């Protein structure tokens, strides 16, 4: 019996109910002028995280991928029931695929999801080839594509549904000396300010892979304050 035959989607539905409740509570507390963005991992990324990038048989990959896609589709459905403005699919590990694999394992899934939920789905990846980028540009119902790399992105911003994600190092975010941390943010923002506001349209300020447990909370507040005051 293969893995898929033993899989019960209802068990996942029950497990993820906490997220459904959480989103309802958040949406109810947010004012109408505040956006709520949901997120999930992409199938390839979830597979790599589950296997810790260990080389595993192609048979297991082929059995697992349809299940992951089913789980993600269900999760997206649940999140979009709660009036979120956009759902982002984070798929950093897709850069490990060659162009043929990207066409086979990523593009069909994105087409299906974006067609089911037109202009409600965004996609994030990084360090991909120009060929993969061109494929993403052709997905008409995909609301947003975010690339965590340059890839000539400054020339592409004015003419596509594309955003540039600039990651602020989470190593710097853990600095305990307030002045050193503040100086690091200022240098980061100074580089951004070298471009006109019109050129910065679509830019996203990101904390790389997020806030670590060792990150001082004051640093997170300072980062948000400086980004909002200096780049608004």
Question: What residue spans do the PLM features occupy?
Answer:
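Short, small-residue-biased leader/transition segments that mark boundaries at the very start
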Residues: 1-3
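Glycine-rich anion/phosphate-binding loops
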Residues: 9-27, 61-74, 176-186
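Glycine-rich, aromatic-flanked loop segments that form ligand/cofactor-binding clefts
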Residues: 13-51, 150-152
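Active-site-adjacent beta->alpha loops and helix N-cap segments on the catalytic face
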Residues: 20-22, 97-110, 131, 150-162
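N-terminal small/glycine-rich loop or linker at the start of catalytic domains
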Residues: 34-63, 93, 160-172
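Short beta-strand segments at enzyme active-site cores
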Residues: 36-39, 80-91, 120-126, 202-206
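Alpha/beta enzyme core
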Residues: 54-87, 99, 107, 111-119, ...
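Catalytic-face loop-and-helix region of soluble metabolic enzyme cores
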Residues: 114-232
